[in-house]
C-alpha cells in the first residue's frame, strides 16, 4: 500500500534539548562503533566544563537531523550481526488478516513501506548475547554498552563520589567491556537486542549498572492510532526512557508494531499473549499453543527485543488468589488463569516453555518472565500466590539459561514500603540474581490520578535495593490510556526514581550532575539550572510564571523568597563578610553577642 497516498505519515518531535548537543565516543576493541552521549553546555561564567549525561534519544535530538519516519532509522547493528557469520536471511511468514485483528479497508493501518527479509540463527547456532558472553566473546554491543555506562568517566574521574549502600551490588569505578561480558555470562545482566532490530542502540539491564526505566505505549480497542504511538515512542525516548513496551490490544497490532520498531533506537518489548488473544477474537478459552507459537515467530521476525511470558501462572496456584482483595490484576495472568480453569490443565506456556526458549534463542529475544499473579493492592502484597509464582519463575530461569537465553524477572505491583525489600531479597535468592524488572511498586492505593507518585516512591526504594529496571506508571494508571503528556510525566517521574537509586547505591558518576546543578543554583545561574534538570522546559516555565523577564534570569533571587529573604543570597553575604574579616574575627564577633547567635545561658527557661 502506498503510504503517501493516505497521507498519514506521522510527524514526530525532533531537535536538541536546551544547551545540549550529541557527542560520540569511539570504541577501542571495535573502532567502528560510535557511542552517543549528551553534552550539556554551561554558562561561560561558571568556569566549568560541560556535563555529560546518558542519552537514549537516538537521532531525534540531533540538530538538523533528517528524520523520515516512512524510511525508518539506520540499521546500526546489521553489519555487526552479519559479521558473526551465524545467521541467515529467509522468506519469513506472510502477514495474515488476523495479525491486524481482521482490520480492512480504511481501518487497516498501512504496512511499513520498506520491509527486509528477517534473519534467524543457522541450524545449531545460538545467536544470543548470553551465548557469545559464555564463549568469551566481547561483541560490539558489549563494548558499546561499557562506553555508554561510563558516562565519560575517564575525563571526570577526579570528581567522582563513592557514597552509598549497594546491598551487595558491585558497581566498578570504570566499566570495561570485559566486565559487561562477565555480567551477561553470569546471567546477572541482559542485553535485549533482537537480530532483526538493528536500529536499536545497545543497552544493558542489570543491578551492577545504571538503573533503567521502561515506558509503556500501545493502542487499545477504544482509542489511539499508529501516528500517536510512534510519537509516544519518540517522546518517551526524548525524555529518557531506556526501553519501550508496545502493549497494543486493539486492531492493527502487527502494522503499528512494525512502524514503531523500524523507528525505535530503544529495545522494544511486547506481551505476545495480547496479540494471540486478538487472533482468536478475544476468547481466552480458544487460545492454543499453535496460535501462540505463530505469534512469537511473527513478532521475533519483526524485531521485538523482549517478550513478557506469563509461564509462571500454574493451575494449582489459581486457588491461592481467591481470597485476595483484588484477585488477579495482570491482564496476561488473568487470561492464562481463565484458560487453565476452562481446560482444567496446565498452562500451555509452562508446558511448551522449552520450545519458547528455542524460538527466542533463534532470534535473540530476551525473556521478561511475567508476574501474572502480582498483587494489585497493598492488602495482597507478598502473599502465597505471588511468591509461589516467583518460585516457578526461578525454575524457568534455569531452563532458559540452559538454552542460552537471556532472562529478566518481572515484579510487583502494589507493595507497602515495609514489605518492599523482602521482594528484592526473595527474587535474588530464588532467581539466581537474574535482573529484576518491577512495576513501581505502588506504596499506597488511595491516590488515583497520582499513581506516578505512589509508585515512584516504591520504585526509588526497590531500585536502591537492587532492581535493574523500573517500569513507569503514569497519572492515568487505573483510569485510562496515557496520552503524550502522561508519557512524559511517567518518564520524568521514573528518571527521578532511577537516579535516586543510583545515588543511594553509590554509583560513582551519579552525583556529578547533582553537584553541577547545586553549584548553578547557589551561583544564581538560572539558565544552567534549567538546562541541567531532567525537564528544562517545565523548570523554565515555572520560573517564568512569576519572573518572566530576561533580567530575572540573572537575578539573585526567585519569587519564592524575593531579594531580601533568599537564603542563598544571605549565604553569599556571609561568605563575603567572612572573607573580608577573616573567619576567626567573625567567630569572635559572634561570641561577643553578634546578631545571629545567642549564648545558651542567656536563654530564659520556659515557665512550663
Swiss-Prot record:
InterPro entries: ThiC, ThiC-associated_dom, ThiC/Bza_core_dom, ThiC/BzaA/B
Enzyme Commission number(s): 4.1.99.17
Pathway(s) it belongs to: Cofactor biosynthesis; thiamine diphosphate biosynthesis
Listed GO biological process terms: thiamine biosynthetic process; thiamine diphosphate biosynthetic process
Binding site for substrate: 216, 245, 274, 310, 330-332, 371-374, 410, 437
Catalytic activity: 5-amino-1-(5-phospho-beta-D-ribosyl)imidazole + S-adenosyl-L-methionine = 4-amino-2-methyl-5-(phosphooxymethyl)pyrimidine + CO + 5'-deoxyadenosine + formate + L-methionine + 3 H(+)
Keyword Lyase in record: yes
GO molecular function: 4 iron, 4 sulfur cluster binding; carbon-carbon lyase activity; zinc ion binding
List of residues binding [4Fe-4S] cluster: 558, 561, 566
Cofactor field: [4Fe-4S] cluster
Keyword S-adenosyl-L-methionine assigned: yes
A single GO cellular-component term on record: cytosol
Record's keyword terms, sorted: 4Fe-4S, Iron, Iron-sulfur, Lyase, Metal-binding, S-adenosyl-L-methionine, Thiamine biosynthesis, Zinc
Note accompanying the cofactor annotation: Binds 1 [4Fe-4S] cluster per subunit. The cluster is coordinated with 3 cysteines and an exchangeable S-adenosyl-L-methionine.
Residues binding Zn(2+): 414, 478
Broad EC category: lyase
Domain of life per record: Bacteria
Family: Belongs to the ThiC family.
PANTHER family, sorted: PHOSPHOMETHYLPYRIMIDINE SYNTHASE, CHLOROPLASTIC, THIAMINE BIOSYNTHESIS PROTEIN THIC
Subunit structure: Homodimer.
Function in brief: Catalyzes the synthesis of the hydroxymethylpyrimidine phosphate (HMP-P) moiety of thiamine from aminoimidazole ribotide (AIR) in a radical S-adenosyl-L-methionine (SAM)-dependent reaction.
HAMAP family named among the record's database cross-references: ThiC
Protein name stated in the entry: Phosphomethylpyrimidine synthase
Organism of provenance: Rhizobium rhizogenes (strain K84 / ATCC BAA-868)
Amino acid at each position: 500500500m502506498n503510504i503517501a497516498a493516505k497521507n498519514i505519515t506521522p510527524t514526530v518531535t525532533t531537535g536538541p534539548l536546551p544547551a545540549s548537543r550529541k557527542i560520540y565516543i569511539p570504541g577501542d576493541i571495535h573502532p567502528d562503533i560510535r557511542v552517543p552521549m549528551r553534552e550539556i553546555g554551561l554558562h561561560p561564567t561558571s568556569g566549568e566544563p560541560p556535563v555529560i549525561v546518558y542519552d537514549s534519544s537516538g537521532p531525534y535530538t540531533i540538530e538538523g537531523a533528517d528524520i523520515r519516519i516512512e524510511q525508518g532509522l539506520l540499521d546500526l547493528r546489521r553489519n555487526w550481526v552479519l559479521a558473526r557469520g551465524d545467521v541467515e536471511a529467509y522468506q519469513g511468514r506472510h502477514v495474515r488478516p488476523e495479525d491486524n485483528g481482521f482490520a480492512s479497508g480504511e481501518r487497516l493501518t498501512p504496512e511499513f513501506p520498506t520491509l527486509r527479509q528477517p534473519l534467524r540463527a543457522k541450524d545449531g547456532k545460538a545467536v544470543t548475547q548470553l551465548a557469545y558472553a559464555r564463549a568469551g566473546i566481547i561483541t560490539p554491543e558489549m563494548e558499546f554498552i561499557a562506553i555508554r555506562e561510563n558516562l565519560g568517566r575517564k575525563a571526570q574521574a577526579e570528581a567522582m563520589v563513592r557514597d552509598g549502600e549497594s546491598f551487595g551490588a558491585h558497581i566498578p569505578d570504570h566499566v570495561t567491556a570485559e566486565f559487561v561480558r562477565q555480567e551477561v555470562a553470569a546471567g546477572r545482566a541482559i542485553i535485549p537486542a533482537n537480530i532483526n532490530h538493528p536500529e536499536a542502540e545497545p543497552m544493558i539491564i542489570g543491578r551492577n549498572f545504571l538503573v533503567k526505566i521502561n515506558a509503556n505505549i500501545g493502542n487499545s480497542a477504544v482509542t489511539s492510532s499508529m501516528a500517536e504511538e510512534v510519537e509516544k515512542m519518540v517522546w518517551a525516548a526524548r525524555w529518557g526512557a531506556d526501553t519501550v513496551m508496545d502493549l497494543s490490544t486493539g486492531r492493527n497490532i502487527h502494522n503499528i508494531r512494525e512502524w514503531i520498531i523500524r523507528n525505535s533506537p530503544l529495545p522494544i518489548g511486547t506481551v505476545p499473549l495480547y496479540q494471540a488473544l486478538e487472533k482468536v477474537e478475544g476468547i481466552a478459552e480458544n487460545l492454543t499453543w499453535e496460535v501462540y507459537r505463530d505469534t512469537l515467530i511473527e513478532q521475533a521476525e519483526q524485531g521485538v527485543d523482549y517478550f513478557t511470558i506469563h509461564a509462571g501462572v500454574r493451575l494449582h496456584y489459581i486457588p491461592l488468589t481467591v481470597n485476595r482483595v483484588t484477585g488477579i490484576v495482570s491482564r496476561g495472568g488473568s487470561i492464562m488463569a481463565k484458560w487453565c480453569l476452562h481446560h482444567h490443565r496446565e498452562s500451555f506456556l509452562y508446558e511448551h516453555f522449552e520450545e519458547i526458549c528455542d524460538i527466542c534463542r533463534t532470534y535473540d529475544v530476551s525473556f521478561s518472565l511475567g508476574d501474572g499473579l502480582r498483587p494489585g493492592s497493598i492488602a495482597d502484597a507478598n502473599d502465597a500466590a505471588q511468591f509461589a509464582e516467583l518460585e516457578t519463575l526461578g525454575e524457568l530461569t534455569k531452563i532458559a539459561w540452559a538454552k542460552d537465553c537471556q532472562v529478566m524477572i518481572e515484579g510487583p505491583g502494589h507493595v507497602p514500603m515495609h514489605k518492599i525489600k523482602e521482594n528484592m531479597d526473595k527474587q535474588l535468592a530464588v532467581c539466581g540474581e537474574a535482573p529484576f524488572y518491577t512495576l513501581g511498586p505502588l506504596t499506597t492505593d488511595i491516590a488515583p490520578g497520582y499513581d506516578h507518585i505512589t509508585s515512584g516512591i516504591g520504585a526509588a526504594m526497590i531500585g536502591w535495593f537492587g532492581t535493574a529496571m523500573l517500569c513507569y506508571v503514569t497519572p492515568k494508571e487505573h483510569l485510562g490510556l496515557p496520552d503524550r503528556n502522561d508519557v512524559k510525566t511517567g518518564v520524568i517521574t521514573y528518571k527521578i526514581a532511577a537516579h535516586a537509586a543510583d545515588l543511594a547505591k553509590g554509583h560513582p558518576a551519579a552525583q556529578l550532575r547533582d553537584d553541577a546543578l547545586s553549584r548553578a543554583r547557589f551561583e544564581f545561574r538560572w539558565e544552567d539550572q534549567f538546562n541541567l534538570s531532567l525537564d528544562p522546559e517545565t523548570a523554565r516555565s515555572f520560573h517564568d510564571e512569576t519572573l518572566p523577564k530576561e533580567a530575572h534570569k540573572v537575578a539573585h533571587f526567585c519569587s519564592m523568597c524575593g531579594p531580601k529573604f533568599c537564603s542563598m543570597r544571605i549565604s553569599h553575604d556571609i561568605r563575603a563578610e567572612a572573607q573580608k574579616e577573616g573567619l576567626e574575627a567573625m567567630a569572635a564577633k559572634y561570641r561577643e553577642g553578634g546578631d545571629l547567635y545567642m549564648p545558651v545561658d542567656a536563654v530564659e527557661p520556659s515557665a512550663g
